[in-house]
């Protein structure tokens, strides 16, 4: 099982480093050349592609991902993720790392199929309504969730006993913040080494569960009255 590196602790596991080798980016299945790590950009195609070709390209990728379930260990999607494509990605049973920048995928139930997954960034998930599929990814080491506007209870994440890095973010591009009912679930996640909590609001206004994260090496919080009151105790964390 993966363990976070010092670099991942300092910057975050999904931080973009210009000096690191980037994944090959492709549009069509025909560009694939036996790589097990790939960036697929098969949506939001420009006017160089006809409507017919756009539909074909998406369908070809969905079929390929389902029909070749042992192909990839890492996938990145920086263009719009659609539900059909999301479901197809979840057929990749060897996948260890998945990055989804944004999209519309209200049903994430098939994520549960990815039992080898260790690193997951799932962004702009405003239509997602349940955390249960994520809570069943027992091998997750690092998780970044962005803009899950329909969810305020993050207690299911306490089931992730190997999780070392957790980032809960709202929407940086708009005034919408993420509302979290309580941080009480953190009391059951003392293995965390990295915790980032930005553009959010804690409904019960209690940030004290963070003080029980004795293995924490990186902490990022939005400044607010409740955080400022805990500052003398927060700076004593490892």
Feature-to-residue mapping (PLM):
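Concave beta-strand-loop units of leucine-rich repeat
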Residues: 3-108, 116-238
């Amino acid at each position: 099982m993966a363990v976070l590196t010092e670099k991942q602790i300092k910057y975050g596991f999904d931080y973009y480093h210009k000096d690191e080798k980037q994944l090959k980016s492709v549009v069509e299945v025909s560009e694939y050349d036996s790589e097990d790590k790939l960036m697929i950009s098969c949506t939001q195609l420009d006017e160089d592609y006809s409507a017919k070709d756009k539909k074909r390209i998406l369908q070809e990728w969905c079929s390929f991902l389902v029909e070749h379930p042992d192909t990839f260990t890492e996938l990145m999607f920086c263009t719009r993720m659609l539900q059909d494509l999301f479901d197809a990605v979840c057929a990749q049973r060897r996948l260890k790392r998945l990055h989804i920048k944004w999209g519309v995928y209200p049903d994430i139930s098939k994520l549960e199929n990815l039992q080898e997954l260790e690193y997951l960034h799932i962004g702009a998930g405003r239509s997602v309504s349940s955390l249960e599929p994520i809570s069943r990814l027992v091998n997750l080491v690092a998780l970044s969730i962005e803009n899950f506007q329909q969810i305020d209870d993050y207690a299911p994440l306490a089931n992730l006993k190997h999780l070392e890095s957790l980032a809960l973010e709202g929407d940086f591009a708009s005034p919408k913040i993420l509302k979290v009912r309580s941080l009480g679930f953190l009391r059951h996640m003392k293995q965390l080494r990295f915790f980032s909590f930005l553009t959010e609001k804690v409904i019960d206004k209690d940030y004290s569960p963070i003080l029980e994260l004795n293995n924490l090496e990186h902490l990022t919080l939005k400044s607010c009255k409740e955080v400022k009151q805990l500052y003398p105790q927060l700076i004593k964390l490892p």
